């Protein structure tokens, strides 16, 4: 593709620079050129002292595209749609839900939302404030808005794509016009997303005038993060080396927690505290063999996966999820096999969810035996997806390494030991110096304060302590003078104090100002981190009044909700507020990025 250059007098480039630019981009597609525009815009605005232009009010033809992402999938879909729209010469403003000024929603004419769901039907962390606002009485009428929603979820959870459903339903209730029916996509979302993106482009091309995308539409919020500019992605991971696999719980602990160190070599892979490490794993060969034998299948039977033909056993080991059952798998297996044991569950969503949650796929087959063809088995299963682990290190200290904290999942089903797919792969089946495929999942919604003087409160029981190890390494390297406070909990002090020596050193050296520990099984009555929060409520409120940033990491379904309830009680009690005002205060902290959560 070539473009006619303007007269040299009008250019800020020398003739030699212009020639190099034209040579470098002569074969770029319109989509690639649009992406490059956003890339350069991002570079300009990350230069020291660079001023970001104040964006003028969006004209009626600008499409607002909101990305509400938890693990990065929704963001990738939104970025791909942005590129499609720019290639179609449509103006689009891509913005993360956490950066969106939601009170301007009444002025939107064209609104596209790509939303994932976390936990039990909750919106992603960056979209909590927007979700709460839209579902509240404060939400305005949207009679002049047209919208479309793409939802991402996981059918292994009961409230599949609930956040997307909430946005779609509420926007319609507020009077907005639905451009397209909502799409709810499972973990294998790519094909559905591609088809939906094309439909969105077609509808919008017919609706708005075509014009060259203006610079204002490619805003800093939609620009490329330079840290993220890497050839290694979820689809094209880095082959790294596992260098350390160390059990960090005691001999008598009920938990098996591993400290894992991975050598990134000279790949140049960069991350920040708060990011996650994606790990591609293989299923246990013994589990694969057990499943094959139960179904009377041969491991060497050739099957087709995508464009590849490979043995069935290899396909099961590398390409399909075997350790997480879902209601859909149970229902489809029951229908396919006409199993007398499972057919009574069909049509009862609650019973299907309960059965799937407590019965792994291999045990479902054992309890309801059948004989399947290889293609029938693969048709039941979901594609294998990588697991994400909160990074427990800072490159300011460990350089070309990345550390994670892995709680190994182990349980018994009628005397048979079962284990989590990725956690047992890392703990049991990878020897030191073995290769492991990894990538960085950046998380801009879990970041240290920009100013090193800001106090930090960290709440992370169990393996939720991982990112706070990274935070402290970074704060130490930066010489940050802000106070640091850690709340940590686990069953037993003697067996389960993860990274104990490191925390004690930070306390001794004064970097860790306070540490409050909750050992749930070391006394007759159970004590959890939320109890410590209530106990230290007055001091916690003082820190918040001083501008402290508050972070929570760990279990989404119970711990994070219990911690949030304790925080609300503290805010109400020591801030002199009623429950509604305390909730509003915490929401404001979230909007200001002073209350951030990494929950799963």
Curated annotation (Swiss-Prot):
Catalysed reaction(s) here are:
hydrogen sulfide + 3 NADP(+) + 3 H2O = sulfite + 3 NADPH + 4 H(+)
What is the species of this protein? Cronobacter sakazakii (strain ATCC BAA-894)
Question: Which EC number applies?
Answer: 1.8.1.2
Give the record's pathway: Sulfur metabolism; hydrogen sulfide biosynthesis; hydrogen sulfide from sulfite (NADPH route): step 1/1
Q: Where does FMN bind?
A: 69-74, 116-119, 152-161
Ranges where the FAD-binding FR-type domain occurs: 235-449
CDD domains in alphabetical order: SiR
Entry's PANTHER family? NADPH OXIDOREDUCTASE A (PTHR19384:SF128), NITRIC OXIDE SYNTHASE-RELATED (PTHR19384)
Q: Name one Pfam family in it.
A: NAD_binding_1
Q: What does this protein do?
A: Component of the sulfite reductase complex that catalyzes the 6-electron reduction of sulfite to sulfide. This is one of several activities required for the biosynthesis of L-cysteine from sulfate. The flavoprotein component catalyzes the electron flow from NADPH -> FAD -> FMN to the hemoprotein component.
Under HAMAP family, the record lists: CysJ (MF_01541)
So what family is this one in? Belongs to the NADPH-dependent sulphite reductase flavoprotein subunit CysJ family.
From which domain of life does this come? Bacteria
* Cross-referenced SUPFAM superfamilies: Ferredoxin reductase-like, C-terminal NADP-linked domain, Flavoproteins, Riboflavin synthase domain-like
Which molecular function term from Gene Ontology is one that the record holds?
A: FMN binding
Q: What are its GO cellular component terms?
A: cytosol
Binding residue positions for FAD: 323, 357, 387-390, 405-407, 420-423, 600
Name the gene behind this protein. cysJ
Cofactors that this protein relies on: FAD; FMN
The identity of this protein, by name, is Sulfite reductase [NADPH] flavoprotein alpha-component
Mind listing the UniProt keywords for this protein, alphabetically?
Amino-acid biosynthesis, Cysteine biosynthesis, Electron transport, FAD, Flavoprotein, FMN, NADP, Oxidoreductase, Transport
- According to the entry, every stretch annotated as the Flavodoxin-like domain falls at 63-201
């Amino acid at each position: 593709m070539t473009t006619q250059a303007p007269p040299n007098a009008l250019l800020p480039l020398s003739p030699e620079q212009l020639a190099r630019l034209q040579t470098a981009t002569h074969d770029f597609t319109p989509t690639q050129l649009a992406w490059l525009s956003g890339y350069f815009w991002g570079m300009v605005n990350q230069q020291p002292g660079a001023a970001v232009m104040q964006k003028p009010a969006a004209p009626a033809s600008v499409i607002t595209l909101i990305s509400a992402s938890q693990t990065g999938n929704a963001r990738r879909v939104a970025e791909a749609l942005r590129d499609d729209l720019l290639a179609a010469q449509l103006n689009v403003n891509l913005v993360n839900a956490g950066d969106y000024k939601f009170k301007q929603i009444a002025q939107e004419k064209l609104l596209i939302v790509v939303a994932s769901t976390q936990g039990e039907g909750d919106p992603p962390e960056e979209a909590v404030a927007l979700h709460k606002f839209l579902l509240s009485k404060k939400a305005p009428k949207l009679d002049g808005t047209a919208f479309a929603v793409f939802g991402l979820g996981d059918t292994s959870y009961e409230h599949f794509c609930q956040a997307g459903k909430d946005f779609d339903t509420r926007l319609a209730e507020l009077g907005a016009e639905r451009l397209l029916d909502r799409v709810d996509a499972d973990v294998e979302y790519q094909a559905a997303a591609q088809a939906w993106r094309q439909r969105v482009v077609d509808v919008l091309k017919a609706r708005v005038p075509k014009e060259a995308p203006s610079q204002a539409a490619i805003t800093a919020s939609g620009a490329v993060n330079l840290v993220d500019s890497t050839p290694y992605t979820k689809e094209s991971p880095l082959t790294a080396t596992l260098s350390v696999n160390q059990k960090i719980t005691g001999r008598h602990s009920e938990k098996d927690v591993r400290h894992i160190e991975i050598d990134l070599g000279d790949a140049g892979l960069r991350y920040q505290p708060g990011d996650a490490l994606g790990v591609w794993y293989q299923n246990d060969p013994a589990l694969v063999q057990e499943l094959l034998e139960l179904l009377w299948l041969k491991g060497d039977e050739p099957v087709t996966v995508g464009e590849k033909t490979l043995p069935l056993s290899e396909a099961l080991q590398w390409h399909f999820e075997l350790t997480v059952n879902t209601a859909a798998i149970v229902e489809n297996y029951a229908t396919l096999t006409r199993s007398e044991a499972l057919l009574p569950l069909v049509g009862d969503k609650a019973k299907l969810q309960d059965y799937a949650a407590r019965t792994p796929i291999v045990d479902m087959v054992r309890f309801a035996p059948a004989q399947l063809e290889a293609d029938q088995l693969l048709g039941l299963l979901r594609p294998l997806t990588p697991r994400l682990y909160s990074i427990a290190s800072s490159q300011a200290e460990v350089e070309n390494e990345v550390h994670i904290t892995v709680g190994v999942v182990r349980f018994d089903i009628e005397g048979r030991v079962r284990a989590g797919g990725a956690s047992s792969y890392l703990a049991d089946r990878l020897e030191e110096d073995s290769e492991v495929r990894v990538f960085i999942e950046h998380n801009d919604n879990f970041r240290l304060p920009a100013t090193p003087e800001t106090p930090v409160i960290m709440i992370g029981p169990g393996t939720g302590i991982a990112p706070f190890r990274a935070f402290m390494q970074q704060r130490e390297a930066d010489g940050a003078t802000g106070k640091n406070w850690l709340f940590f909990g686990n069953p037993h002090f003697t067996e389960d104090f993860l990274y104990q020596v490191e925390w004690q050193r930070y306390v001794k050296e004064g970097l860790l100002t306070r540490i409050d520990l909750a050992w749930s099984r070391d006394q007759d009555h159970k004590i959890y981190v939320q109890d410590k929060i209530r106990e230290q409520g007055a001091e916690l409120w003082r820190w918040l009044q001083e501008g402290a940033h508050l972070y929570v990491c760990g279990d989404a379904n119970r711990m994070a909700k219990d911690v949030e309830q304790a925080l609300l009680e503290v805010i109400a009690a020591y801030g002199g507020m009623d429950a509604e005002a305390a909730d509003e205060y915490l929401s404001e902290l979230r909007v200001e990025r002073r209350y951030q959560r990494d929950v799963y």
